[in-house]
Amino acid sequence: MSKRATRHAIEFAHKRILAKNPNGEAFKERYGDSPPGFLVISPSRTCNLHCKGCYDGTEEAPSILSFSTFDRILNEASDLWGMSFVVISGGEPFMYKSDGKNLLDMVEAHPDLYFLVYTNGTQIDRETAERMGELGNITPAISVEGKVKTTEDRRGEGVFGKVMNAFENLRAAGVPFGLSMTATRHNCDELLSDEVVKFYFEEQGAMYAWIFQYMPIGTNYDLSLMITPQQRLNLQRRMWHVIEEKKVFLMDFWNSGTTVHGCLAAGRQAGYFYINWNGDVTPCVFVPYAGANIHEIYKNGGTIMDLMEVDFFKEIRNWQHSYGYKTKPAQTKNLIMPCVHRDHIDVLFPLIKEHKAKPLNQEAAQALTDPKYYEGLHSYDEACAKVLDPVWEKEYLKVNGQGTRIELPAEERPLPETSH
């Protein structure tokens, strides 16, 4: 890594792990809990690819988050929450332009924040990579779907070669980079195969990967693309095997629920809110229903703190606490089924309707009125529970002499079985 990248990585780790957060203490006095840990912001929907099953969905006239509003959001989150980490998504973030400025101008304007950027990688030329290396407080997570053919089947012909060019440019500039991987029913077994792990992490130098199990939202959503319950368990087993054997940093937003005590949505402590290009604020990137709009909040003289008072978000946080966040083991439900959307549709949809959360796009509106969508996810939840509940009970909990469930220490948990 470049010297700047190394310095910023060390400073970020110190802030997140060792340093006290005075802003967080004030927040805790007011709300009874620590503040959200980060934001996910998609400042623009503009993208040069048309990936199959993109989560963005269809909009007639998407906007762009102005540079000034984008900047204000980051300043407020830093000042009021003590936030030191921000995630950027899209669209394609490196195509963002506003008031003659781009994403890297925003990164430069906030040297005290560390930026994780989800990108398709096609815009990372040598000049862009060199500037990222000079800034030091940014790391791109580049989207791949596995091998060459699998990646191009979803993302388009020629994309894999551009990703390889991006890797080369980032290595030359000393920029730490990782991967963003979407697991579907078709590529799930390939995604963390020995061949794929060796290629990306050992040969190309990727330092981490974030795994997203396909969510049936956005463009041409398709429930049949979701990984099966057994594939989901196999992926969890394989993920922990790769972590232990290859020492690779991997996180799966569903299968890693045990490491973060469940769902992170709706501004939970150490969790996040999602803000898109229209200023709409949703609980999660994968819950396309807005409980607020940042432009309206600012118009009414508010700040980002007002998000904590939105009833839709409050109700989700209440559910998180009742489900397993900061609960005793006897009251903790299955944290490898943590998602309020895909794993607990019977919880989410009534809340959306009760609080009149606004669908972000045509597909989100359609899902609310499509009985097959609800029934399909509900059936999926039940099928997953049959496979994953016994794993939760056997591998993460045990019963003591008084018949009380207690959580197994990590060193006592059975090693995951692997089939790869």
Label the model's feature ranges.
Residues L264-Q269:
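Short, small/polar residue-rich loop motifs at catalytic or cofactor-binding pockets
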Residues H186-C188, Y208-P229, M251-G262, P288-G291, ...:
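Flexible glycine/acidic-rich beta-alpha junction loops that bind and position SAM and/or redox cofactors
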Residues D71-I88, Y96-F212:
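Radical SAM/AdoMet-radical enzyme domain recognition
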Residues D56-L65, P288-N293, D343-N361:
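Iron-sulfur (Fe-S) cluster-binding segments and ferredoxin-like electron-carrier domains
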Residues Q362-H420:
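C-terminal non-catalytic accessory extensions
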Residues M1-E130, L135:
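Conserved alpha-helical substructure of the radical SAM core
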Residues Q230-T259, F286-D346:
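C-terminal accessory region of radical SAM enzymes
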